[in-house]
Amino acid sequence: MTNIRKTHPLMEIVNNAFIDLPTPSNISSWWNFGSLLGICLILRILTGLFLAMHYTADTATAFSSVTHICRDVNYGWIIRYMHANGASMFSICLFMHVGRGLYYGSYTFLETWNIGVILLFATMATAFMGYVLPWGQMSFWGATVITNLLSAIPYIGTNLVEWIWGGFSVDKATLTRFFAFHFSSPFIIAALAMVHLLFLHETGSNNPTGSLSDMDKIPFHPYYTIKDILGALLLILTLMLLVLFAPDLLGDPDNYTPANPLNTPPHIKPEWYFLFAYAILRSIPNKLGGVLALVLSILILVLMPLLHTSKQRSMMFRPISQCLFWILVADLLTLTWIGGEPVEHPYIIIGQLASITYFTLILVLMPIASTIENNLLKW
């Protein structure tokens, strides 16, 4: 008798993706973040669905509907905070996942990598639109400032901004469309994630050494299912610690004040996971230049396969590149810190230096280091 999981059309897909999938025997915990992102996405779609049942996308009632969810709905507070803090967990997993891809040279899987970059953009757009929905001060002014950046585009900029706003300022039309897009985009992200996985399974997973592992593979289940379950438990534990003990730790106090178009907060800033890009944006005095730098700070990931000059795929045996990679991580942490500080001395110059360092490391120093390491191999 043949096994149903290998013959049934639907079960076969699941079997080939999660059970009998040939997986390198030496992949480390850095390979856990893909499954953790999947768990984050499912968790956030479910909590978002329950929030949408009680939320009203109207400027007059949006803020009070969020208050109503927290105060009157059964377990509404935990659903709301799991959704909000889930965004932070999602972002941490995303950064770790991308960082692992950079470190171990996973960007040589071109289709998988490029779809991953599209997924990153889609997730950032979704998170931004979600931040606008509670209609607090930072929601309103964040939406105003970030959408206004599009006005820097020559010729069509102003028309484009007014088209997105649905009027001459951020108002009811903007909130309604942001809710519509925020509700639908996670399903697009889920579909893209499926395509991401499809292309990954065409080539098979990379491994820490970056070498071919066809001769030494093991089935995904039970070895990596148990490993992923451990990762999932740690993720949920961290999330619940955040939700139950410090739910507002990563939020902005200004968002507990209803949106007021007549009163600008002293310091407008996005959520913490956008601060690195926001710091790069602010470090360039010219508006269009800042917007281009902001987009390029993420789009630069697409160039990684072209900038790869090393004969080795992974950084595991490349000490100079390793050193530069960790300097890049420190630089991103510096940018995150600067993005949350006011625009004054010495933060301006630190932000500008960190921004220059970011692009120089990726575009110049890392390819040079790889070439030096290639020559060292000849010794």
UniProtKB/Swiss-Prot annotation:
InterPro entries: Cyt_b/b6_C, Cyt_b/b6_C_sf, Cyt_b/b6_N, Cytb/b6-like_sf, Cytochrome_b, Cytochrome_b_C_euk/bac, Cytochrome_b_N_euk/bac, Di-haem_cyt_TM. Belongs to the cytochrome b family. Gene3D superfamilies: Cytochrome Bc1 Complex, Chain C. The chain crosses the membrane at residues 33-53, 77-98, 113-133, 178-198, 226-246, 288-308, 320-340, 347-367. It holds the Pfam family Cytochrome_B. It is found in: Mitochondrion inner membrane. Its cofactor is heme b. This is Cytochrome b. Its main location: mitochondrion. CDD domains: cytochrome_b_C (cd00290), Cytochrome_b_N (cd00284). GO terms for cellular component: mitochondrial inner membrane; respiratory chain complex III.
